[in-house]
């Protein structure tokens, strides 16, 4: 809540993107995926987090108000403790009736991240050159996507070469990993499978991302 003011004016993170803030958000997503809900995929762009729960998740008997309050509280606590300063998250629940709408939702978020990143880089480039808030906002709002790319390129910024996480956000999901264990019955070292959280800063694009999300639905 109020993250734009907090990040740019009070905490003074680098604009438009700061890897320190990204890592705080990644920490928060990982916490939410281990705090008691059956979350199979977490996605974050900017200061927003989207969680995909298992179809059969019955945490708090699926009571929407309870889910919202607990997840918002967990996110707020995890971020605040990691950062050392207070932050507050709100939350909402979207109940989607089929797999297509789930995929569409995450693809929309993916595309929204791209649009926001392009606008943010243009806006903050102009601000750092000395433009006022109103002048920079007006200048960016009247440009097409291609013109925004050109504007950045004129100032030695190739948007296509910027880090993927800035343009498309990042995902967190479970992967199976082999780890070395010990079998006391046979007195042998064995390989065991474990589910570990993986943070992916290079998500696939377009239709490939749709397939990726579909594979996470269980």
Describe every region a protein language model picked out:
Residues 1-218:
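Regulatory and interdomain segments flanking nucleotide-handling catalytic cores
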